[in-house]
């Protein structure tokens, strides 16, 4: 993987990730394909929304179908027939979200398989091996996603262990002869001094890109913005920056304003299945009765298949009848909305008009522009 940085506007960056499998224009949004599928979508449909890279989930694919089934097909690309690049998370977030059924040690994490209850062990080395077998174009280190709230002492211990695990991840990744990219994950909760230690430690180890982890886990939005403003300038400018698990459209806008290049989140797909649709002027909750006889398109400014062909009334009807097509059409639209948003941000950065774009984005939704505390 090669990262090319074209231009900046304030702290926002316009560039691209270059892989053997294709080019990803940045800032980018990665749809989430947890089980080897972006829910309800064929790879061709996902690509048609403008997505150039997707995310796969190491933890879930390890449990089902497992490494051996994956290797029978070649790798995850062959298994799911996605031709572009794939980023896989390390499994850390899923393991730590298991709560009481897992035990963290210095060596790794012991837990019960949530499918059948069998005891399982996952550590940095195993995570690197699974992601190698998946053929991931971007591999994420195995870390502990520090929960929120966490006091300073806990956050420090967690961050320091994640740094030790980062070194073990790097060593196993290299020993496998993996020629793809490996990203480090910055931890430290909402504490700037801990984030400083994490960034320096990861940069000393050396990675192809750097993710900001442990945000969007319940902390106030102001804290997320503050940490991004503090951390992003410390990440080497020639490496991509990835904000994990984020988020709402406004979170993408605010991340880009602070220097983030990559995002992922289940929100557009999960919300689509619940009739929660993102449009230029805000949100449409399509199951509301007021859309029963609305013959207009979902979003007159959207060029997706759904908006070009169907009315709000039809989408309302499908939702009320629990028709699978409704979830699919909603997903097509939400994914396209996110890709159109990212394309708009990229164009605005190219033209040096990002703040004008941001102001228009919020004004059209009747909202104030959040403060930006950067030099």
Swiss-Prot record:
InterPro entries (alphabetical): ArchSynthase1/Queuine_TRR, TGT, TGT-like_sf, tRNA_ribo_trans-like
UniProt-annotated binding residues for substrate: 89-93, 143, 187, 214
GO cellular component terms, semicolon-separated: cytosol
Pathway as given in its UniProt record: tRNA modification; tRNA-queuosine biosynthesis
One record GO biological process: tRNA wobble guanine modification
Domain of life (superkingdom): Bacteria
Alphabetically ordered keywords of this record: Glycosyltransferase, Metal-binding, Queuosine biosynthesis, Transferase, tRNA processing, Virulence, Zinc
Pfam families given in the database record: TGT
Residue numbers binding Zn(2+): 302, 304, 307, 333
Transmembrane region(s): none
Cofactor note: Binds 1 zinc ion per subunit.
The EC number(s) this enzyme carries: 2.4.2.29
Active site: 89, 264
Catalytic activity: 7-aminomethyl-7-carbaguanine + guanosine(34) in tRNA = 7-aminomethyl-7-carbaguanosine(34) in tRNA + guanine
Region (RNA binding): 245-251, 269-273
An annotated Gene Ontology molecular function: tRNA-guanosine(34) queuine transglycosylase activity
Cofactors, names only: Zn(2+)
Oligomeric form and interacting partners: Homodimer. Within each dimer, one monomer is responsible for RNA recognition and catalysis, while the other monomer binds to the replacement base PreQ1.
Family: Belongs to the queuine tRNA-ribosyltransferase family.
UniProt function note: Important for virulence.
Cross-referenced HAMAP family: Q_tRNA_Tgt (MF_00168)
Record protein name field: Queuine tRNA-ribosyltransferase
């Amino acid at each position: 993987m090669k990262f090319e940085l074209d231009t900046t506007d304030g702290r926002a960056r316009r560039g691209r990730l270059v892989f053997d499998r294709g080019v990803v224009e940045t800032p980018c949004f990665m749809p989430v394909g947890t089980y080897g599928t972006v829910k309800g979508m064929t790879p061709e449909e996902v690509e048609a929304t403008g997505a150039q890279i997707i995310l796969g989930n190491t933890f879930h694919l390890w449990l089902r179908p497992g490494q051996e089934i994956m290797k029978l097909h070649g790798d995850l690309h062959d298994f799911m027939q996605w031709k572009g690049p794939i980023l896989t998370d390390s499994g850390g977030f899923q393991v730590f979200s298991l709560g009481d059924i897992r035990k963290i040690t210095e060596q790794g994490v012991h837990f019960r398989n949530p499918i059948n209850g069998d005891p399982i062990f996952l550590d940095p080395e195993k995570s690197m091996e699974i992601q190698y077998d998946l053929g991931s174009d971007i591999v994420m280190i195995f870390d502990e996603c520090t929960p929120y709230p966490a006091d300073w002492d806990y956050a420090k211990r967690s961050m320091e262990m994640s740094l030790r695990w980062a070194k073990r991840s790097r060593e196993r990744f290299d020993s496998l002869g993996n020629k793809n990219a490996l990203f480090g994950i910055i931890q430290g909760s909402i504490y700037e001094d801990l984030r400083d230690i994490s960034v320096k430690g990861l940069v000393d180890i050396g990675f192809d890109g750097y993710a900001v982890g442990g945000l969007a886990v319940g902390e106030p939005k102001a804290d997320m913005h503050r940490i991004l403003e503090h951390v992003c300038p410390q990440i080497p400018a020639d490496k991509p920056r990835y904000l994990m698990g984020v988020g709402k459209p406004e979170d993408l806008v605010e991340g880009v304003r602070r220097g983030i290049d990559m995002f992922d989140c289940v929100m557009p797909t999960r919300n689509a299945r619940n009739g929660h649709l993102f449009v230029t002027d805000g949100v449409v909750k399509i199951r509301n009765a007021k859309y029963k006889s609305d013959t207009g398109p979902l979003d007159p400014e959207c060029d997706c298949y759904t908006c070009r062909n169907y009315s709000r009334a039809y989408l309302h009807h499908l939702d009320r009848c629990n028709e699978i097509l409704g979830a699919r059409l909603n997903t097509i639209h939400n994914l396209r909305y996110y890709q159109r948003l990212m394309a708009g941000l990229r164009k605005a950065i190219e033209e040096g008009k990002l703040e004008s774009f941001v102001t228009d984005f919020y004004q059209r939704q009747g909202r104030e522009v959040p403060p930006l505390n950067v030099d």
